[in-house]
């Protein structure tokens, strides 16, 4: 129904060793006949994801390129009214859709990340891999003006971490992704 209505559809998959690795080619093949984006998202080593058997983005790409050697990198395109997102897209000539990769660990895109998240508790998270952010609930409930809230947002975003530190020893896994909007 969404595709028939012209709504852009993105189908996300987190490839996991021994869980869904046998389905990756079938998922990618959906983009052959359907105008959608099939995106493979690398498991972030956060919370329980730190101990899950994940597949690296470059390994999934190599696997799909063996199946479809003509899988070609697409030029980065800006999302409507937004800066570039974290996905890198590929397409087989003649396909209606594309295949994307979001590889936070093996394709660090921090420098170009334009994402922030607001938790259900009113905390603005600047990065999924960091506890950095600011409380927006308190000023909202205290009647802060739009200008004051905008100032808070701007100041917080200026503090957005430059990069994550996955792979460094001694970095504890933070809350589970389901608790931080990931």
Annotate each language-model stretch with its function:
Residues 45, 106-107, 130-132:
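Short, solvent-exposed loop/turn segments at secondary-structure junctions
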Residues 3-100, 104, 140:
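Radical SAM enzyme [4Fe-4S]-AdoMet core and its adjacent flexible, acidic
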